[in-house]
Amino acid sequence: MKRLVPNAAIAALACAAASPSALAQMAPTLYGLVDMSVGNFQTPGNDSLRRAESGRMSLSYVGIRGSDDLGGGLRARYALETYIRVDEGAAGRTGGDPFWTRTAYVGLQGAFGTSVLGRSPTPLWTATRMFNPLGDSVGFSPSIRQYFGGTVLGDTRWNNSVAFSSPEVEKGFMYSVQFNAGEGNPGTTGKNTGVGALYTSGPLQASGTWQRVRNGPGPWPAGFDHQSTFQLGASYELSFIRLYGQVGRVKTNADVDVRSTLYQVGAASPIGLGFLLASYAHAKDEVASTRSYRRTFSLGYDYFLSKATDIYAVVMNERFTALSSANTVAAGVRLRF
């Protein structure tokens, strides 16, 4: 009991020191995005389905965030974000997701950069969405669909991770690193490691990203040991168009090794109050002496009704080896708050 008294006294003093004005500065901010679309959706080898879908252009989510000014340019910050399936009124991308699936971290930010602990996006995910014209669209972006539709293992966010993002360390140059420990996840051992670099010079942006995955959500191939992914990306803005390009290599070491080579080219051009978006991605998968191919093309128009609300229409064609081709036609609305 004697050991508890000093701790209780310290806690009481801390609460007394936290004035209403100080607590007001730490008040959390509520924010998010709601996206819904309707249309005919199809995947290779399957029939077309007429549906109303959530999160095709951007995954819907709700988040809270806040920070505490510690003085001397140092801040403590946190964020908690959950995906929302608006069409079902349910949390998560799927029923198997934990509640705070999108982000859950706490960390420090200062002149040295930003360091966070918890669950946060990987450098590979960040670079992939930056260097294609349809951004983070899991429903319509050829690049996102080819990388994260089954090729890259370990999810777009890592649990139990330590992540660091630098400020601008040289003219136009920034970098990020992330790693996590497996912490006994079933069927996997070891840690995940990811690094990324970003360079900006006028109309040019370029990135290089590498990650090595040894744990995360499954399923995992038999005899899985690790997977390595390397990606280069770039964009260049002209007066009337922004051009995008990506090239990547994914190698999965398991009982049967798989090597995938991925390419993406795209463009975004302002037309009226919106943007015409076009992207093509090509993937070659090699398993032993067998090769298969995946080709995805998307064309869309994104029209902004305001800074917070846009409407869009997209057509997409996908062709996979040995499967019938698929065509998707959809239109939707997206609102940020």
Locate predicted features.
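Outer membrane beta-barrel
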Residues: 25-40, 49-182, 189-191, 198-202
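Repeated loop/turn-to-beta-strand initiation elements of outer-membrane beta-barrel proteins
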Residues: 74-76, 112-115, 170-175, 203-208, ...
